[in-house]
């Protein structure tokens, strides 16, 4: 999905990333606040995280309009994202962390890269399975259409 992007599309991606990160950060902060004994602050973070999710979804709806999406497109976009993480992002991050002597970060990036590959493989397998199913459905629909056409021809020939 390497298409040229407008500045607005880039801004939507950045806004989505910010809202999604805020959601995860606030959920984490809520857990920490609860462990530290402050339930009121934990709930504040959790409510705010829910609102951030709404903001992120609003951006996603503009980035990936429902009217333009198919199951195949969704799976392909997800696959490409996971492959980017596997082949480019995490290896680069791991190397940079290695150069800076951040061994815990190196291990984290390597582990996440491996998990991203697993995710990519799952999306690819489902994409292949869906393609086979749609191909089979196409044959079934063609057979039905042929029978309908034959039946219509018999009825109109009378």
Feature-to-residue mapping (PLM):
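Non-heme di-metal
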Residues: 1-158
